[in-house]
A protein has these predicted regions:
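Non-catalytic helical/linker scaffolds that mediate oligomerization, partner binding
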Residues: 5-478
Length: 478
């Protein structure tokens, strides 16, 4: 991994600077979930080479031992591909789940008993029975099993199966149209945050985000551990999250549209509209936005996607989101590398002729960011910036450059965090002044052949502490 000695050696003319730049093709980033199919360093490296920039560990599954193995594999893959990779911890969150049971396959028309303890299916949550009423629809897993409540007596309920499948331990349970009062963070979530603070995670996803206070609590815990650099992403997947998405977006570092869980609460035909509205909220608040789940579900078993899946990815790119999240396709699927490769192919195709929608720029720093993006486009120039914290890069990404832009950063922590942003390509050049940071970044890009004779370069930096903006245009001499 890159260290300060390498920075110094590079600046003194030594060629030992080993970080290889990724000459990016896809502007929309790909997040791949790790699991049994993709937990080795070699597979992660292959996924990174064909288009994945960020890797997600779902903390609903496994334990610290299995997570540690995946973290180590990502670090190993970084060495193989010679670039920093984003690493996301997805908290399990407060969710109703089935207890430990023997798997039971249910058939339509049959009846089954849910109980707080015992019964055919154990639901170890009093909150579930407190909101349950006759006629309620209960969904299990991703909605593969649906039931209607026939009667409720205390902590026991009798339900009739509408749609049958296998019911297993730890599957999520949703009462359609109702949200039980659950804790903001579970004890497991807090344990996970302590683990995250000790490892090289760049982002945390807060599952079932319902309020701004929930996001602030996660941020304060990370701050107490000295990890204020970790970006906090709010997953919108419940009706309360949808209702409060504006206030949540104001405090979160990014928004995740969890379409799978939203489909448990809303009619499926409503999901595209909800998705569009959430994306619009995030974009107008200059926050990164990610679409999640079921993009290439058929590739869990098959080596190529369906036509409708290709169209889904295409349309997601056309609304200019920052990243797309693969879940089971790469975690448990038979073709994790091919899945990433297919998603990257569709993204690149969808970008052709894309007319990006740019939000209005109100504050001065946003006007500067938009102006830089448009200046680079008008000059057909390559945009190069230096950012100590990554905030300037986030603002640039908000205005959707139509080709990659390069961000000189002081550390690998900042580089990993920026991987999730639209079109960004972070380059670690060390902690220095803004002027020197730009010099180092452009010099490195020249050495790697990204910048060359005949190129026009727009260079920029912004110091929030000093209130100083630095902008210059250079024509590379032939």
């Amino acid at each position: 991994m890159l260290n300060q000695n390498l920075h110094l050696n590079y600046l003194s003319g030594n060629s030992v600077f080993q970080r290889v730049l990724c000459l990016r093709r896809n502007l929309v980033k790909i997040i791949a979930t790790l699991g049994p199919s993709s937990s080795s360093g070699s597979v992660i490296a292959q996924m990174a080479r064909v288009g994945a920039d960020i890797f997600r560990i779902n903390m609903s599954h496994g334990d610290q031992r299995s997570w540690e193995s995946m973290v180590s594999a990502v670090v190993e893959a970084e060495s193989m591909v010679e670039r920093d990779l984003g690493l996301v911890a997805d908290l399990e969150g407060p969710r109703l789940r089935i207890g430990d049971i023997e798997p039971v396959r249910v058939q339509p028309g049959s009846t089954i008993v849910f109980s707080y303890s015992g019964g055919d299916v154990t639901i170890p949550h009093r909150e579930f029975f407190e909101v349950l009423g006759e006629g309620d629809i209960v969904l299990i897993g991703d909605g593969k099993v649906s039931l209607i409540v026939e009667s409720v007596e205390g902590l026991t309920a009798k339900l009739k199966v509408l749609q049958g499948d296998l019911i297993e331990s730890r599957k999520g349970v949703v009462v359609s149209g109702k949200e039980p009062e659950l804790p903001t963070l579970t004890a497991k979530d807090k344990m996970c945050l302590e683990y995250v603070a000790r490892r090289p995670f760049s982002h945390v996803m807060v599952s079932y985000a319902r309020s701004s206070e929930q996001i602030e609590l996660v941020r304060s815990i990370l701050r107490d551990y000295g990890r204020q650099d970790v970006k906090v992403l709010a997953k919108i997947e419940t009706p309360s999250g949808v209702r409060r998405v504006k206030e949540i977006a104001q405090v979160a570092d990014g928004i995740v549209v969890a379409r799978g869980d939203l489909g448990m609460h809303y009619s499926l035909e409503d999901i595209p509209v909800i998705q569009r509205d959430i994306v619009k909220v995030a974009r107008t608040q200059y926050k990164p936005v990610i679409l999640a789940t079921e993009f290439l579900s058929s590739m869990i078993e098959k080596p190529a996607p369906s036509r409708s899946e290709v169209v889904d990815i295409y349309e997601a790119v056309r609304i200019s989101v920052d990243a797309l999240l693969l879940t089971g396709e790469t975690a448990i699927g038979r073709y994790p590398v091919k899945t990433v490769q297919w998603m990257s192919r569709v993204i690149v195709k969808a970008q052709q002729g894309l007319n990006v929608d740019r939000p209005p720029a109100v504050a001065q720093i946003y006007r500067l960011a938009r102006g830089l993006v448009e200046l680079a486009e008008n000059l057909n120039a390559i945009l190069v910036i230096y950012s100590k914290t990554g905030r300037f890069a986030e603002r640039i990404a908000s205005f959707r450059p139509t080709k990659p832009y390069y961000v000189g950063v002081p550390s690998e922590k900042v580089a990993r965090a920026l991987r999730i942003l639209w079109a960004s390509e972070p380059v670690v050049v060390g902690d220095t002044s803004y002027e020197e940071g730009l010099v180092r970044t452009s010099r490195l890009l020249e050495e790697k052949g990204v910048l060359g004779p005949g190129d026009t370069v727009v260079e920029a930096a912004w110091s929030s502490e000093k209130g100083v903006y630095l902008v210059r245009v250079r024509n590379m001499v032939v």
